Amino acid sequence: MKLALISDLHANREAFSAVLEHARAHGAGRFALLGDLVGYGGDPAWVVDQVRELVQQGAIAVMGNHDSAIVTGPLPTMREDARDAILWTRSQLDAAQLAFLAALPMHREADDCLFVHANAFDPQGFEYIQGRLEAMRSLHATQCRYTFCGHMHEPKLYHLSGTGKAGEFVPSPGVEIPLLPNRQWLVIPGSCGQPRDGNPAACYALFDMTTGLLSYQRVPYDVDAAAARVRHCGLNETVAERLAQRLLQGE
């Protein structure tokens, strides 16, 4: 069975729709949503409803820092654009949608897999995995062979051998990577709704749980339409324009 790993949707309806269609066309039978369903994008209610429906069908979903901020309020450390988007997003969600976000777990374990938004060593702290040091700290914090996480908006792959040797890899889209069973693996699929590597195409990954093959995917979508939704959603015009440009430029 193929598992679609989708993270950092950020209320981007166009990107999420394209990724769902692509994943299903490539054999995905199950979905894991790795947090930050909302924030930045112009369609939070639609995205939350889609994720809630997937969860009802058996998908895994965990809480991201933007999802948490919707429930508890923006953190003081959040940038102005993120804070404004959080406050606007909260006004767009009904009680049931807010309750769904509030009930999301910080992490889930299933079939030797850990699903978490930021890291395994402090899921609620939302510390970034910016390199090998944080990745190894995360891998040492779990007994699971596979850790799937988001938060970082660029695709990356880390591994830890039985002898303690660490490695990291920047994957190429569409290339199957065998996740060897004698290692631990940390998979960051990149952002579906707001990639930040200079390429606006949506990111996600497919993991074949039978063969152990992982592939990172890039999915072009109507980024102009997504940017237009942000511009006209009701956010402050200056903030909305900055967020729209980030989508268009993949940053």
Residues covered by each model-derived region:
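Active-site-proximal beta-strand elements of phosphoester/diester hydrolases
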Residues: 2-10, 112-119, 186-190
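Core catalytic region of metal-dependent phosphoesterases/phosphodiesterases
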Residues: 2-6, 11-98
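Active-site environment of divalent metal-dependent phosphoester hydrolases
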Residues: 10-15, 39-41, 66-71, 121-123, ...
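His/acidic metal-ligating clusters that form di-metal
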Residues: 26-27, 92-161
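Charged helix-capping and loop-helix junction motifs
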Residues: 45-47, 129-136, 168-170
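Short, conserved loop/helix-junction motifs that constitute active-site signature segments
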Residues: 53-56, 140, 179-180, 207
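Acidic, His/Gly-rich catalytic cores of divalent-metal-dependent hydrolytic chemistry
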Residues: 162-251
